[in-house]
């Protein structure tokens, strides 16, 4: 055939010859073939020629118009198919698809409900359940999926109804039932998204061992699955497998070197493994692209304070941190560097917000005493002792003020 030989000029000649000479039946077969291989203009021309003999090709014309983005034209073709036609249910189903494409899911649902008045086709029930799930009508979606034969629907669509029911129950907060259906779906056919949903659900229920099991399945079977490493590393951390958690986080960073969440957990795990240098490096990389740097600045300040790197803490002021604890570490840095007046200014700004923090008050009190602000120191010592009444050293200091 000319098309198979990629001789388009010869194919064009055959096409117009067929239009002039071939019967409607032969043209119908040719049009469906052309439509199937993406030659929509030629298929459309034939369908328009034979539409009187085969009114069902209004469906094909509507589908082609939809492919071309001509939605109004597609609807116009579908309106030609009346309720007494054998193709009316198909027209309603295609209308539902078009309305969904237009973002009118409620109207699409109405069309499928109308179609179900004429037919109990499982694919219509499935389509309605899919729409209900999209519209967050999860209970209705579950009822729809439950009517269907899972194996039959999977063969026709590649989608497991058990999986869909599990997802819907998860959205309803019924996690125990959700995991039952998702596990059943996974037993019948492995699916990355199902395994990920199961792992995430078990993590949220603090069943970390089971979460690790399903994350490991993904890691073994589908290591290219996007984004599982963050949850997997967190689950391993909860199971006290710290070195393995860091390894998985690093594995994720090989795919996405600037993924903020992974950089933060890699920093955390490095810090817990007493590798402060790596912890700092991960934070510095994260700081470059993160939309919100507050947590990053707090962690950096914490590392610098432990290492008595007060100048580095003061340099963080250029980032204009808003976190109160980061600001307090800046105040403490001035205090440790004997710039007491500047430290005092920072402490005063923070005092109202951190008045219930005993450690803050303790440092503030000693700063006030050193600056000779004895009355203010006594007031704060009184507040401190309300929070920590058994601090003998502070009681003695209070009595001397």
Feature-to-residue mapping (PLM):
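Short coil turns that delineate tetratricopeptide repeat
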Residues: 21-23, 52-55, 86, 119-120, ...
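Start-of-helix register in tetratricopeptide repeats
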Residues: 25-27, 56-59, 89-90, 123-124, ...
